[in-house]
Amino acid sequence: MDFMTIFFLIIGFVLLIKGADYLVDGASAVAKRFGIPDIIIGLTVVSMGTSAPELVVSVGSAMQGSTGLVFANVIGSNISNTCLILGVAGLIVPLVVQSTTVKYELPLSILIIPLLFVLSNDAMLWGAQESTLSRIDGFILLTLFVGFLYYVFRSAKNNPDEVEVIDPLPAWKSAIYIVGGIAGLIIGGDWVVSSAKEIATTFGMTERLVGLTVVAVGTSLPELATSVVAAMKRNSDIAIGNVVGSNIFNVLLVLGTSAAIMPTNYELAINFDLYFLMAVSFLLFAFFFVGTLRKESLYTLDRWEAALLLIAIISYFTYIIVNDPGTAAAVG
């Protein structure tokens, strides 16, 4: 590995993030021109755009045979969303969230974790020769995703003020944004996957470790920026809703699409990461309910709780780096 590998990794992340932004802007403007309501655009094009980097990286990894990156990217992104993003945002200002997020969306983001465990662990649970997230599993996840979209659509109809208003663009600019966005996603995704594999090979790291750390944090940068800005503007609902929604999209849409296109082998080592994701998701859920005991029924994430989330992810990263088979062999 040389300097160019790091360069292509960084540029790949930039292309992924900006490509998603341009694709969302262009597609939203086109949809607006066809008279599609803002509520539909916001819940489909805009929402899916935040998960576009994870989707491109996971599908690209599956097609290149890098199965370790497929699951590690999604699970690592959800861990980063929960601990890193909410940890940073919660340190800026205590976060207050709507009751519907705590009662419905957050529990769903927790429940799909054991579902993914059951769908993926064929060898452990059913005695199969290998564990695979099959096309059928992918369609199950996508079906649940459609159901989730329907629920969000119904909820948004009751709260139209919370839906982002889409500004139209000239037709020529929309076309450039769409083409440029797709190109950025494709090229950026390829560079990120290739660079991540090169880093893993050079340092003797497993693809799982690179996916859980470098790739996961990199693809979570849009959510980090959105949530930090929202926290600074005292828009706690956006900060938390952005993270919870992204976690649901990543599992149901990203892994669902990836498996539907290319069935993916599942590594047993990923179970530890699923357990950790489940634990910190429950911890976040508990933090909000602790807030109701102190603050007159407000669901709150205080600064000390945000600090605990940051400590959790630092401890997690330290553990998986020290115990990664590749790094352990290199040290030994």
Residue ranges of model-derived segments:
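Hydrophobic alpha-helical segments, chiefly the membrane-spanning helices
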Residues: M1-G332
